[in-house]
């Protein structure tokens, strides 16, 4: 293994994640399932995917949604997310992915035998077609500040949100710890199984920041481990009393 890769693992927190995976493997007495992104990609109907690509694919999509039609790349990215959460180890979980997009993350989870549900807006026909192609269940809902999520009929062991935009991303309404507190408390009370985990992945703002010092401090006070853009609660701790009083 190259030295540069080892150093990158240390400084991004990947070393901690890797160590925990090894401990969990030892505790469970099993190795992770042997599969890779290429193997999973081959399970997607090539003719149906090609038809979607021909409708929406562009040579240089930039930051626009057709970039997600680079199937192999995004399968690799989402497989890493799955492994970082230990979803390739242990038993069957219920997984909710908020802002599920094309559904790749949930497709891999479903491939591993997990019970999955996505949540997103219905604004990009290409996302809808990909979710349908992958056979991923999805509910349509717009997340708003200080508004609870709908009753989904069950609770989840793992709740994720990748490349988040619902937090007022790149606007003058970027969420503070008060909005995040309402959101997290709502998840904890109505959507999350006791002891479940929440993993949030933030996008960079115009100033290239991922979160304010206030949000970082608040998240860590609730038990989060922060690795670059990823804020991982495992488990989520109650809100600090001072913040809870202020938010209300």
Where are these regions (language model features)?
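Conserved alpha-helix/loop element of class I SAM-dependent methyltransferases that forms part
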Residues: 71-92
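Conserved SAM-binding loop of SAM-dependent methyltransferases across substrates and taxa
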Residues: 102-112
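A short SAM/SAH-binding and catalytic strip from SAM-dependent methyltransferases
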Residues: 157-177
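A short glycine-rich, Lys/Arg-flanked "PGG" loop and its adjoining helix->strand segment in the class I
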Residues: 174-194
């Amino acid at each position: 293994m190259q030295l540069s890769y080892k150093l990158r693992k240390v400084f991004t927190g990947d070393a901690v994640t890797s160590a925990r995976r090894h401990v969990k493997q030892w505790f469970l007495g099993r190795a992770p399932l042997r599969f890779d992104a290429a193997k999973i990609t081959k399970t997607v109907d090539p003719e149906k995917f090609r038809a979607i690509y021909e409708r929406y694919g562009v040579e240089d999509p930039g930051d626009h949604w057709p970039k997600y039609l680079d199937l192999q790349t995004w399968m690799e990215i989402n497989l890493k997310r799955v492994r970082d959460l230990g979803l390739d180890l242990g038993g069957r979980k219920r997984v909710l992915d908020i802002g599920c997009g094309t559904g790749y993350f949930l497709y891999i989870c479903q491939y591993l035998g997990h019970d999955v549900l996505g949540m997103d807006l219905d604004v990009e026909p290409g996302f809808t077609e990909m979710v349908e192609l992958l056979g991923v269940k999805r509910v349509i809902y717009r997340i708003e500040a200080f508004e609870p999520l709908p009753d989904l009929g069950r609770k989840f062991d793992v709740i994720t949100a990748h490349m988040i935009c619902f937090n007022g991303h790149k606007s003058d309404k970027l969420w503070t710890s008060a909005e995040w507190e309402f959101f997290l408390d709502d998840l904890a009370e109505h959507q999350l199984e006791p002891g479940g985990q929440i993993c949030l992945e933030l996008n960079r703002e115009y100033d290239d920041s991922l979160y304010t010092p206030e949000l970082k401090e608040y998240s860590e006070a609730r038990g989060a481990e922060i690795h670059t853009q990823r804020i991982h609660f495992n488990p989520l701790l109650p809100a600090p009393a001072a913040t809870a009083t202020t938010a209300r």
